[in-house]
Each structure stands twice: as structure tokens, then as C-alpha cells.
């Protein structure tokens, strides 16, 4: 299989001065022979099977057409696996580059070489080798110029434009003029108007006019003081004369008195008539009570239909004039009649509101006494309502005020289904046992239920059942017999099962002694915490102690 190629001898001339012959050829060893392998024909990767002969079958392919073998040397030289059919040169000559423009319309696939990207160096992909250029960084962060100390500090400093600043604007706000710098205007005026006594050089004046690119503003012009000040000020279009302000000397004495009472009074500049202070809203408590006591407003609004149609709707000229004043006593008598009729039919919450109004009216501040003479002659609405409430209490028709209740259900309305009533606290219950339990727990302090283990007493049975759960699982020891009974039972053989039952069954262990089980269960039950010492007699709850 393996054939060896003959080695070619190599000779080298060496000089020897000792011998008579000055040069001779020395035989050098040849290189290591290279092994050659015979060419192997290509075999198809997929096997081909013949189809079984049938009427409609065709003869199978005998063999696949072999691919032509190229004249490659048989030596195992490292080469690419798919051998290209034709090699293309990577270098574009100048003669070929000149002919590209004419050949591009005739042949396909001939284009200019692609431009290298910015992230790679020059002539790395398909550009000519003679092209040598530096890559441009895509991000200035990777350029490395940030850490160089030789850069001037003026490069990194932001540019400033003093012309665009609002503080350097020479014109008033909201005026369409050029935004010129004050310093530039002054400098330009000095250049245009040279002083007769000064000895300045004439080179400064034509500097601005000769080179207009030095100044961003237009060519300055001479302006007078009157032209700069006589412009249309937008503030004069909206604001009137400044002298039309409110003067403190024009205030009247009535206004000063109203300001001392902390009441707001508007004063017109043309001496318009003013409204008097409303005496009903002098104190804050009266105003707040009118907002909070909604029951009174409801009772006033829930009158008869005839009263609402006659009194509330009929508003003539006299009533409009008397609107700021308080209502007369006749209207209060009518209100009292309607209120008394309604209070006789309502329940206890109405009485509470009446009593609260009387208490709040008695504790009113002294500001109510400093009212006008008209309001002092007529009683207030709150006093009338409290008097009407007191009259209903004296008659005895109203229900007493409900006391504070104890429990989860705090309903304001009484349930008619609760037929059993407590005589001491007027509390009602649906069942008689609930009433008895209420007597024992609150009034009599009777505790008929007692715990059998710790002796603690309870007034309710459900409390006892809940307490009994704290004494453990309630395991009962199986060893109920005493020591004498256990000794007699052991002597008679009752503690062990008869052994003849398991004599026929092989490898069956004998049952253990039940006496040992009884002792273990008794000890476990004794170690369970929950004795009477763990709980106090006053009923305070404590957590159960656990033993490790």
C-alpha cells in the first residue's frame, strides 16, 4: 500500500588545507522521505438500493456517475476541503481597474471594491493594498483624547453667547427690537462720536465698519434719548393709571368698625352702598352647627305641602327687603307647631340632637351678645329649638336617651323581635337563656360552671368548654387497675396472651406486656401542663407553658 520515493543525494564542497587535495565533496544525509497514498475513488454517501422487480417497475440505476478526478498530486498536502474550480486574484491591477467601467455593462458580478468600515483598518477587506489610511472612530469616547493633558482648556469649555442672554438685553421686555448688548452699543456710540478733547487713535472707529463680521448685531445707528423712550409699552395697554389706587384716608368709620370685628366688607371706589354685617354668622359655632345638625334642617324642610306652597314660594317686594333681617316671632311659632308634631312621632335620636343644641347654645361665646339691637330683640333659632325639645321632655311623651351598649351589635333602632328585656340596663334579647347569661355575667357575677381539673369557675358554659381545651388532649391511661390487682393478674397469667395460639406460626414475636404501655401513657398524661397553678383566679389569660 505504501510506496517510498528514492532519496536524492546531496553533496557539499569542503576545504581542507592539510591534505593535498584542496576540496572534496562530502555526502550529506537526505531529507526524510514522504509517504504517498494512492488516490481513492469517491463513494456516494447515500446507498442506492434496487427496487424489486414488478410489472410497472423500471430497472434501477446500476451505478452513479463518478465525478472526474482532477490531476492533483497524491501527496497529503494540507489544502482546503472544497477545492475551487477557478481562483480569483485578490489584487486589482491598474489596467483592470481602467477597464471596469466598460466591462460593467457587459458582464455581471464586476463591481468596485467595497469600502472598508470605520471600525476596521484600511485595506483589510477588499480594498487595494496600496491604499493606506487610518480608521475613523465611531464613538469619540474610544478616541483616547480625553486623557491627553496637552489639550487646551478652552476646547472643552462651552461657548458663551452674551448677545442671546436676557440679562444683557438693552430693550424693554416684549418689544420687537434687536437684542443688542449694552456694552457693544456704548462702544459703537463712542466710536461714531469721538470726543473733541480726547486724543484717541483713529484706528478704533473704522474697525467696526470695515469688518462687519466682528459684531453679530446690525450696523449701529445714532439714536437720541427721545427715540429710545418713546416706544409703545405693552404694559400701558392693560394697566390703567397708576394713581387710581385705594387710599386709606377714604375709608369710612363704619368700615373701620367692620374690620375690627374681623368681617369682610367690600368698599367700592365710587362710594357705592355697602351691605351690613349679617349677625347670624358672627360666631363660628353657629355656622358650624348649621352645617353639622342635619336633623334640624330636615325637620324645617319637611313641613306640610300647604305651608311650602304658601310661605316658601310667595316672595313679594316686602319680603325681599326684609331678607337680611331675622324672621319674626310669628314664623317661629309656626315652626314650633310643626316641630312638636314631628318630635312626638320620632324616636330617641331626635331627643339627643335637641339636648345637644341646648347645651351648645348655653356654651356659646360672648360674641353673640355683641349683636345689633334688631337681632337682640328676637330669640335665635337655636334657643327656640331647645325650648321645644324641653317641652317635649316635660310632657314625657319622648323616649329616654339610649345608654352606652356593650357588645358587637350597636344598632340605634330597637328590634321588635327582642321580647326579653333587662330591668337593670334596659337591654333586650331574643331568648330567655341569653337574658339569664347577661344577668350572671354583668349584674350578679354568678359563676355556676366549674372546671373539674383545676377548679376554675365560669359564668358561661361556652367559656368553660373553651377553657377545658387548655388541659391537653384528654388522654385517659389504660392502666386503671392498682398495684395489687396487677400483681394478682400477673400471678394468674392474665397479663400475657396464651402462647399456644402462636405455637403453630413460625417467626412470630410474642406480644409485649401491657403493663409497660399503661405506665408510659400515665406518665405522658401527668406531664401534660395545664394545672391550676398556671392560671390565676381573676380570669386573666396566660399562655400555656410548654415543657421540652
Swiss-Prot record:
Per the record, the major location class is nucleus
- Could you tell me the Gene Ontology terms of the biological process aspect for this record? regulation of transcription by RNA polymerase II
Q: Which domain of life is it from?
A: Eukaryota
Per its UniProt record, what SUPFAM superfamilies does this chain match? Answer: beta-beta-alpha zinc fingers
Q: Identify the PROSITE patterns for this entry.
A: ZINC_FINGER_C2H2_1 (PS00028), ZINC_FINGER_C2H2_2 (PS50157)
InterPro entries referenced in this protein's UniProt entry, alphabetically: Ikaros_C2H2-ZF, Znf_C2H2_sf, Znf_C2H2_type
Q: Which is one Pfam family of this protein?
A: zf-C2H2
Record flagged with keyword Cytoplasm: yes
Q: What happens when the gene is disrupted?
A: Leads to excessive accumulation of lipid droplets and restricts infectious growth in rice. Results in fewer peroxisomes, more lipid droplets, and higher levels of phosphatidylglycerol, phosphatidylinositol, diacylglycerol, triacylglycerol and free fatty acids.
Give the record's GO CC terms.
Answer: nucleus
**Zn-finger segments (C2H2-type):** 420-448, 449-471
Q: Where in the cell is it found?
A: Nucleus; Cytoplasm
Q: What is this protein called?
A: C2H2-type transcription factor MSN2
Q: Which organism is it from?
A: Pyricularia oryzae (strain 70-15 / ATCC MYA-4617 / FGSC 8958)
- Cite the source lineage: Eukaryota, Fungi, Dikarya, Ascomycota, Pezizomycotina
Amino acid at each position: 500500500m505504501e510506496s517510498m520515493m528514492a532519496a536524492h543525494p546531496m553533496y557539499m564542497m569542503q576545504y581542507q588545507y592539510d591534505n593535498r587535495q584542496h576540496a572534496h565533496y562530502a555526502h550529506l544525509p537526505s531529507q526524510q522521505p514522504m509517504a504517498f497514498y494512492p488516490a481513492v475513488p469517491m463513494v456516494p454517501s447515500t446507498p442506492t438500493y434496487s427496487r424489486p422487480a414488478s410489472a410497472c417497475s423500471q430497472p434501477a440505476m446500476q451505478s452513479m456517475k463518478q465525478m472526474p478526478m482532477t490531476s492533483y498530486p497524491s501527496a497529503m498536502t494540507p489544502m482546503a476541503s472544497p477545492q475551487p474550480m477557478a481562483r480569483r486574484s485578490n489584487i486589482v491591477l491598474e489596467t483592470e481597474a481602467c477597464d471596469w467601467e466598460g466591462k460593467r455593462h457587459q458582464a455581471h458580478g464586476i463591481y468596485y471594491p467595497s469600502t472598508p468600515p470605520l471600525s476596521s483598518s484600511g485595506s483589510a477587506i477588499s480594498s487595494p493594498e496600496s491604499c493606506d489610511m487610518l480608521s475613523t472612530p465611531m464613538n469619540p469616547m474610544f478616541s483616547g483624547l480625553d486623557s491627553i493633558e496637552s489639550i487646551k482648556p478652552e476646547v472643552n469649555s462651552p461657548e458663551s453667547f452674551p448677545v442671546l442672554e436676557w440679562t444683557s438685553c438693552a430693550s424693554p421686555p416684549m418689544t420687537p427690537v434687536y437684542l443688542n448688548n449694552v456694552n457693544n452699543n456704548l462702544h459703537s456710540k463712542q466710536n461714531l462720536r469721538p470726543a473733541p478733547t480726547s486724543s484717541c487713535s483713529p484706528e478704533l472707529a473704522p474697525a467696526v465698519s470695515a469688518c462687519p463680521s466682528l459684531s453679530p448685531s446690525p450696523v449701529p445707528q445714532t439714536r437720541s434719548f427721545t427715540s429710545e423712550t418713546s416706544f409703545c409699552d405693552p404694559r400701558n395697554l392693560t394697566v390703567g393709571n397708576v394713581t387710581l389706587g385705594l387710599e386709606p384716608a377714604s375709608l369710612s368709620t363704619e368700615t373701620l368698625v367692620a374690620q375690627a370685628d374681623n368681617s369682610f366688607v367690600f368698599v367700592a371706589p365710587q362710594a357705592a352702598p355697602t351691605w351690613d354685617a349679617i349677625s347670624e354668622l358672627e360666631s363660628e359655632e353657629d355656622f358650624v352647627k348649621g352645617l353639622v345638625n342635619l336633623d334640624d334642617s330636615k325637620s324645617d324642610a319637611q313641613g306640610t305641602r300647604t305651608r311650602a306652597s304658601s310661605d316658601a314660594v310667595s316672595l313679594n317686594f316686602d319680603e325681599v327687603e326684609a331678607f337680611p333681617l331675622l324672621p319674626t316671632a310669628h314664623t317661629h311659632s309656626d315652626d314650633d307647631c310643626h316641630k312638636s308634631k314631628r318630635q312626638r312621632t320620632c324616636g330617641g335620636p331626635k331627643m339627643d340632637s335637641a339636648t345637644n343644641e341646648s347645651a351648645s347654645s348655653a356654651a356659646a361665646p360672648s360674641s353673640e351678645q355683641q349683636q345689633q339691637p334688631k337681632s337682640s330683640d328676637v330669640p335665635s333659632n337655636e334657643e327656640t329649638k331647645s325650648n321645644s325639645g324641653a317641652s317635649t321632655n316635660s310632657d314625657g311623651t319622648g323616649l329616654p336617651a339610649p345608654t352606652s351598649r356593650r357588645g358587637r351589635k350597636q344598632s340605634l333602632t330597637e328590634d321588635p323581635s327582642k321580647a326579653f328585656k333587662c330591668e337593670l340596663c334596659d337591654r333586650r334579647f331574643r331568648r330567655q337563656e341569653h337574658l339569664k347569661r347577661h344577668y350572671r355575667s354583668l349584674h350578679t357575677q354568678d359563676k355556676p360552671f366549674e372546671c373539674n381539673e383545676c377548679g376554675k369557675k365560669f359564668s358561661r358554659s361556652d367559656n368553660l368548654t373553651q377553657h377545658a381545651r387548655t388541659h391537653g388532649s384528654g388522654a385517659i391511661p389504660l392502666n386503671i387497675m392498682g398495684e395489687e390487682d396487677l400483681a394478682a393478674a400477673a400471678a394468674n397469667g392474665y397479663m400475657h396472651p396464651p402462647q399456644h395460639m402462636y405455637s403453630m406460626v413460625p417467626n412470630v414475636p410474642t406480644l409485649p406486656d401491657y403493663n409497660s404501655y399503661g405506665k408510659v401513657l400515665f406518665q405522658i398524661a401527668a406531664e401534660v401542663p395545664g394545672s391550676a397553678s398556671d392560671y390565676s383566679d381573676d380570669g386573666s389569660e396566660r399562655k400555656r407553658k410548654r415543657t421540652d
